[in-house]
């Protein structure tokens, strides 16, 4: 992604005089900053779809290494102490058989030598698929969707991993619940991101 990016979420910007995308200008978020490898357009969107829905689990190894190569400096600068994948609901996990965000987080963890903590964040509410919803609908759909393990000892700086950042609703909700649990700073990385304005 070579274009000018939003300094908060990393969406590419059309207007080079701006520092923030329209979404980040309008709202205060629960996370500090985030970045993505690519814009969510073909062929990237096709590859992410195959990773997610067509059992192309080995893509996660390649993409996880790519995340480490591209963002190693950023991750070190953020002072990340643990990597947490965005969880799937139990029913979706049973149906799919794997969590693509967890596979990405595992590979990134191995490359960076930072622990992945997968049993921290839980999806306790079965949500409707987000792909056909606007930002407000996504936010309502995700309200109360996540919980944090009561036995977890919160870290100061956490990195959330997901496959796609569209409106940011998933990252927002997950970051909010982690902060309520005592995390000070939440950052995110995703494979791809929607287009900014």
What are these model-derived regions, one by one?
Residues 1-197:
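Glycine-rich phosphate/pyrophosphate-handling loop used in enzymes and phosphotransfer proteins
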């Amino acid at each position: 992604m070579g274009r000018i990016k939003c300094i908060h979420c990393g969406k590419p910007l059309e207007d080079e005089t701006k520092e923030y995308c329209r979404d980040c200008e309008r709202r205060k978020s629960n996370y500090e900053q985030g970045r993505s490898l690519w814009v969510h357009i073909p062929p990237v969107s096709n590859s992410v779809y195959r990773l997610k829905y067509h059992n192309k689990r080995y893509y996660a190894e390649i993409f996880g290494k790519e995340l480490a190569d591209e963002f190693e400096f950023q991750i070190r600068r953020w002072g990340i102490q643990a990597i947490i994948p965005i969880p799937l609901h139990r029913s979706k996990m049973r149906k799919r058989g794997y969590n693509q965000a967890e596979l990405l987080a595992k590979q990134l963890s191995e490359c960076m030598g930072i622990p992945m903590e997968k049993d921290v964040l839980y999806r306790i509410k079965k949500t409707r698929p987000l792909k056909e919803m606007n930002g407000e609908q996504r936010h309502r759909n995700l309200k109360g969707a996540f919980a944090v393990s009561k036995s977890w000892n919160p870290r100061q700086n956490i990195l959330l991993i997901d496959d796609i950042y569209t409106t940011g609703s998933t990252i927002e909700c997950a970051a909010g619940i982690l902060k309520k649990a005592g995390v000070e700073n939440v950052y995110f990385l995703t494979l791809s991101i929607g287009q900014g304005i």
